[in-house]
């Protein structure tokens, strides 16, 4: 339940609802959480997960029409990743 709460907060941060992207935020949050549990002392694993997620976002947005394109850019994704990392203590409970 906590990852969903974090993701909704991220969504409202940008003033425009981006409902179609909610599942992506949840998936990203769980991916980061999993990488921490797999090897919590290895920051490289965390950033590898983030990089792969970032790459999949940019690839999908460049190759497909998406309702998220206008309100969701690469720079906002970096902010979203930061927000998820900041809230990781809550995700781990």
Curated annotation (Swiss-Prot):
GO cellular component terms listed in the entry, alphabetical order: chloroplast
Protein localization: Plastid, Chloroplast
Record keywords: Chloroplast, Plastid
Protein known as: Uncharacterized 10.9 kDa protein in secA 5'region
């Amino acid at each position: 339940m906590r990852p969903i709460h974090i993701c909704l907060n991220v969504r409202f941060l940008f003033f425009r609802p981006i409902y179609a992207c909610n599942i992506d935020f949840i998936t990203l949050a769980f991916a980061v959480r999993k990488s921490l549990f797999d090897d919590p002392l290895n920051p490289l694993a965390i950033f590898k997960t983030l990089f792969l997620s970032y790459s999949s976002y940019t690839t999908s947005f460049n190759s497909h029409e998406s309702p998220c394109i206008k309100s969701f850019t690469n720079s906002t994704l970096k902010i979203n990743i930061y927000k998820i990392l900041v809230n990781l203590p809550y995700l781990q409970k």
